[in-house]
Amino acid sequence: MPTAFYLFFSGMYQDTPGNFMRDYLLSMTAFSMMSTAIFSFPTVLETDRLNNWQKVLRHTPVSMVEYYLIKVAGLFVDFLLSIGVVFTVGHVVRHVNMPIQDWVLAAFLLILGSLAFVAIGLVLTLLPSSQLMSVAGNLLYMGLAVMGGLWMPISVFPEWMQAIGKCLPTYQLMELIKTFLNKGQVNGFASLYLTLFTLVLFTLVIVYRRHSEVRA
């Protein structure tokens, strides 16, 4: 779906000056990766839980840390596939061109920044039912995409919506990447924001899981 969105919307703005086509390519790549992290990843974990696979693992030499690392590794393979597909379409169909080092840097930052989406996916697994997880996932997915500026620049929104958008990880991830590509500099605020956002959510999940195990 993100690839189709990119082809459709970028086709409407092909004559837009500046780096619009490049930036929109990066936005749709992030959109694709977020879909995997917020939908596919929690669903896999929830399926394992419902099938009691996670309980079975506790009686094997495989630790839960190793279990999650394996799942995250598989998720990053999906991320690489998303990057490869969307980047290829952007380059071949929309003629987006960058130096090879910029393609690699953009891919690296997308993967690094996507840890924030992975953290969101893990938080969703804390919800008490699959139905609630699905509803919350859909709301977060669309909200982060639209309000965070992945579909359109947040400058088209009223000021109060722009203020909200700038507080979202999707917006800060794109700011991080664009600052690197445009200025060759580290966006300190975006880096700090994404790091703290990810660490807070990971900590929340760990604390909740440990508390649940103690109660069990």
What are these regions (language model features)?
Residues P2, Y6-G11, L81, Q101, ...:
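Alpha-helical transmembrane segments of multi-pass membrane transporters/translocases
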Residues F9, L127-C167, Y171:
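Transmembrane helix segments
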Residues M1-D15, R22-S40, L80, Y141-A145, ...:
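Hydrophobic alpha-helical transmembrane segments of multi-pass membrane transport/permease proteins
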Residues M64-V65, I70-L139, Q185-T195, I206, ...:
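Alpha-helical transmembrane segments and their short interhelical loops
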Residues Q14-V44, F108-L126, T179:
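Hydrophobic alpha-helical transmembrane segments of membrane proteins
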Residues S10-D15, T47, H91, H95, ...:
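Transmembrane helix-loop junction
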Residues I38-T60:
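Transmembrane helix boundary and interhelical loop/hinge segments in multi-pass membrane proteins
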